[in-house]
């Protein structure tokens, strides 16, 4: 994977930081960026005392800077798993990594994070429970789409409480919704912290935000080719609405964000 090789190449040019699960670190200071080398992080905020909100989940290759995360009260980065990060000073990296590669990578990843913030606002502000959960699972699945693999394994190392917090629903509602997705053949449980997406097309149909999620996550081929300079070649053939590295255009048509029918009563089954 080109992004992974690029991250490895710059690891020796920055300060490495290793985190234990649930360890917290503050946002990087102005002028610094953090690149997640491996593991998963959560961006947390606590606008009021004792009320934590998960803003996003970060995976390997994601980039965080002070300019992409608002300095809300109590904001921090929390390791979901053991994680490795690299703290970079852009001018220092510029000396050894070609400028167009370096800036293309950072800008693409930072804009990707901002686009995800907008999608998250739509998810929790306008979608009912089932399309909200479907959108969350779809976003994770699209990161791992491969043309030769019809089924996709999605790792879920975060707790269900964290997922429910991110989606602004309660724990039991999340569990019931995931069980319904299992019952109708959309997904199946692979392990305690992983699911397998069985029918990606059907999952897309459950999410009114599928087109936006595809624009942000399914361009992984472009992201993988960033460091080899091939992204610019592919960009010319992409629809204009999907350009600018995943930035959501000012006016977006994502299908109706209508309220779904009343939630069916499902008994909790003690797991997904």
Regions found by a protein language model. Name each.
Residues 2-24:
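Short proline/glycine- and basic residue-enriched helix-capping loop/turn segments at helix->loop/beta transitions
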Residues 18-82:
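Cyclic nucleotide-binding regulatory domains
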Residues 56-119:
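Cyclic-nucleotide recognition modules
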Residues 101-170:
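Polybasic "coupling" helices that flank or enter modular domains
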Residues 142-237, 269-272:
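Phosphate-/nucleic-acid-contacting segments
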Residues 226, 238, 247-252:
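Short hydrophobic transmembrane-like helices used for membrane targeting/insertion
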Residues 243-246, 265-267:
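Short hydrophobic alpha-helical segments enriched in small aliphatic residues
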Residues 251-272:
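Long, low-complexity, intrinsically disordered segments
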């Amino acid at each position: 994977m080109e992004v992974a090789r690029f991250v490895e190449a710059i690891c020796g040019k920055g300060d490495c930081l290793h985190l234990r699960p649930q360890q917290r670190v503050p946002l990087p200071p102005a002028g610094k960026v953090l690149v997640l080398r491996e593991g998963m992080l959560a961006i947390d905020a606590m606008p009021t005392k004792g009320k934590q909100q998960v803003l996003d989940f970060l995976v390997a290759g994601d980039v965080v800077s002070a300019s992409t995360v608002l300095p809300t009260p109590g904001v921090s980065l929390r390791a979901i798993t053991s994680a490795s990060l690299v703290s970079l000073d852009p001018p220092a990296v510029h000396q050894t990594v070609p400028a167009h590669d370096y800036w293309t990578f950072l800008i693409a990843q930072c804009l990707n994070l901002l686009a995800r913030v907008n999608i998250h606002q739509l998810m929790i502000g306008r979608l009912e429970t089932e399309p909200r959960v479907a959108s969350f699972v779809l976003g994770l699945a699209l990161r791992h789409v491969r043309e030769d693999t019809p089924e996709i394994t999605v790792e879920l190392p975060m707790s269900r409480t964290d997922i429910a917090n991110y989606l602004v629903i309660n724990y039991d509602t999340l569990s019931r919704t995931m069980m319904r997705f299992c019952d109708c053949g959309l997904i199946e449980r692979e392990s305690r912290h992983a699911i397998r997406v069985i029918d990606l097309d059907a999952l897309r149909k459950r999410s009114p935000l599928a087109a936006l999620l595809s624009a942000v996550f399914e361009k992984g081929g472009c992201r993988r080719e960033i460091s080899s300079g091939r992204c610019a070649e592919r960009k010319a053939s992409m629809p204009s609405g999907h350009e600018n590295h995943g930035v959501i255009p000012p006016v977006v048509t994502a299908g109706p964000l209508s309220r779904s029918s009343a939630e069916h009563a499902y008994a909790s089954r003690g797991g997904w």
